[in-house]
Amino acid sequence: KKRLFELPKIEYSYRSINSLIKSINFCKTKYPNLQIKTVIVDDNSKDKNLDRIKKLIDGKNIDIISLNHNKYKDLIKEQKTKETFSNLASLMNSFEIGKDQSEDLIFFVEDDYLHFEPMLEEMVASYERIASQLKKDLFMCPSDYPYLYMNNEKTNILIGNKRHWRTINKTLCTFMTSKDLLNKYWENFEKTCIDR
């Protein structure tokens, strides 16, 4: 896949993880009692790249687990490319980790996004505010996708903590939700990973 800056994939992943760590640290200054656990699903990284990530996360509450492709061979339909299968397996593994290990809010993050330092604090505060106002859990996406403005769909603007949020009816794979919604819609999450 052609990238804007044409650097090796590790450069995007490293910068993404580093910006996420900074955002987590900022969030902890605002919510010192908030328990944040991060799990990285590694899909056969080269040893030198994995070592670089391990140095970055050393001493932080971050685990790395290796993706087991064989676990998903019977679940995921045969795909045109190994990369597509790997992406679906990684996504399924991430959803399973969220389902099995989370307690409250879950934030699924792709490895090529850069995060503003106050991003996580804004999401947690806005989630709490909006979910309280709506009296229900929700899905929250920190990314703004310009292609979502191309059609003329009805939308709502919600006031968050320090930013406004727009309702959408689709997202990619970076979003926050509750464990309750993950469980409630588990079949949908599974179906998302079975085939592309």
Question: What is the role of each PLM region?
Answer:
Residues 34-38, 62, 104, 135-139:
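Residue-level recognition of the N-termini of beta-strands and the immediately preceding loop/turn
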Residues 111-114:
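The conserved acidic donor/metal-binding loop of glycosyltransferases
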Residues 2-11, 76-83, 190-194:
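Short, flexible/disordered intra-domain loops and linkers
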Residues 98, 105, 116-189:
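Conserved catalytic core of nucleotide-sugar-dependent glycosyltransferases
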Residues 46-103:
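Active-site-proximal specificity loops/subdomain of glycosyltransferases
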Residues 4-34:
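Short, acidic, metal-binding catalytic loop of nucleotide-sugar glycosyltransferases
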Residues 30-45, 66-69:
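Short beta-strand/loop segment that forms part of the nucleotide-sugar
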